């Protein structure tokens, strides 16, 4: 047999592009003009005063992948502000016996905080304990828009919430999340007992009845911290949920177009995370970055506050 591979007459994968440069580079720096950029690659580098350092096919549209999250971050901060917090309401239709620590009735949870996670369920249990409540004779009920632990299935989220509320049902993952939360928030030593609330009823997805009374509201971290976490981990789930708060990818596109002046034919999104077929030109992305930087300054923030910084963030 021949030692030289022979190409198949009908290859499974066929090249559709070329690694050869298809255009010359526009640059204010002579040595950069000699750089051969392969294929159809869009590049635009500008100095802070707006001078072009390097440019190549910057008006063509490309799939920006996770750079879409920059647009989503801009849109949610522009709409809600950096200090916005998602509320999660805790309600009841029952009565409380302080001598036994028993709540006779149901507990209802409302809210659609996309960052609501395992440790936040334990935090609600801790707050119920602070009110003296340690057992509930009724059901645990969540509304149909309740989100927990990156699950949009409300029934699954409700079951996860019940497991995080009751110390007897918690697994090692929930306990680890709670301990990490105490450590990172500087609250180690402030919670003397293990938070726990037991339920004798079931777990359901229903609306909150009109006779229910609010016990308290749990608030998320500020929007700027949620955006920072989303960007550091390039979290597709968080990015999609934040985009949903605005009306989806189309709404994110419109907010960017209206506030930056980029034309619709150079900036259109199918998703809020970067998954799927999105199309953005380097020129449009540069306009977004400039406007975003300016708006962050008005919020007394910089890109460091909402994007990962190498060697500093983990």
Q: Where are each of the predicted segments found?
A:
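Active-site-adjacent, His/Asp/Glu-enriched structural segments that form or flank metal-binding
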Residues: 89-158
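Short, well-structured active-site flanking segments
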Residues: 78-93, 299-304
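A mature extracytoplasmic/lumenal domain signature
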Residues: 47-49, 58-60, 72, 90-96, ...
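Beta-lactamase-like hydrolase cores
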Residues: 2-61, 124-131
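Active-site SXXK
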Residues: 50, 64-82, 140, 230
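Extracytoplasmic/secreted cell-surface and envelope-processing proteins
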Residues: 53-54, 117-121, 149-152, 252, ...
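Extracytoplasmic
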Residues: 38-40, 48, 57-59, 65-68, ...
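A small/polar active-site loop signature that marks catalytic segments
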Residues: 135-136, 146, 156-310
């Amino acid at each position: 047999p021949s030692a030289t591979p022979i190409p198949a007459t009908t290859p499974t994968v066929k090249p559709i592009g070329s690694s050869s440069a298809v255009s010359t580079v526009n640059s204010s720096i002579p040595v950069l003009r000699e750089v051969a950029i392969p294929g159809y690659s869009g590049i635009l580098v500008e100095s802070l005063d707006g001078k072009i350092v390097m440019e190549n096919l910057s008006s063509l549209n490309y799939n920006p992948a996770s750079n879409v999250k920059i647009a989503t971050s801009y849109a949610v901060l522009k709409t809600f502000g950096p200090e916005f917090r998602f509320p999660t309401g805790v309600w009841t239709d029952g009565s409380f016996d302080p001598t036994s620590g028993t709540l006779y009735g149901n507990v209802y949870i409302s809210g659609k905080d996309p960052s609501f996670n395992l440790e936040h369920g334990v935090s609600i249990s801790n707050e119920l304990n602070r009110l003296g409540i340690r057992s509930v004779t009724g059901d645990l009920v969540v509304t149909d828009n309740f989100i927990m632990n990156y699950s949009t299935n409300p029934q699954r989220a409700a079951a996860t919430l019940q497991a995080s509320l009751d110390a007897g049902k918690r697994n090692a993952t929930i306990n680890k999340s709670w301990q990490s939360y105490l450590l990172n928030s500087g609250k180690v030593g402030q919670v003397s007992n293990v938070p726990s609330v037991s339920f004798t009823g079931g777990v359901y997805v229903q609306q909150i009845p009109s006779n229910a009374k609010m016990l308290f509201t749990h608030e998320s971290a500020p929007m700027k911290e949620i955006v920072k976490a989303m960007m550091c981990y390039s979290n597709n789930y968080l990015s999609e949920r934040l985009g949903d708060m605005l009306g989806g990818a189309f709404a994110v596109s419109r907010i960017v177009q209206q506030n930056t002046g980029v034309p619709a034919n150079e900036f259109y999104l199918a998703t809020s995370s970067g998954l799927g077929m999105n199309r953005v030109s380097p020129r449009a992305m540069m306009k977004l970055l400039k406007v975003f930087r300016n708006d962050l300054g008005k919020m007394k923030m910089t890109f460091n506050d909402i994007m990962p910084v190498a060697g500093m963030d983990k």
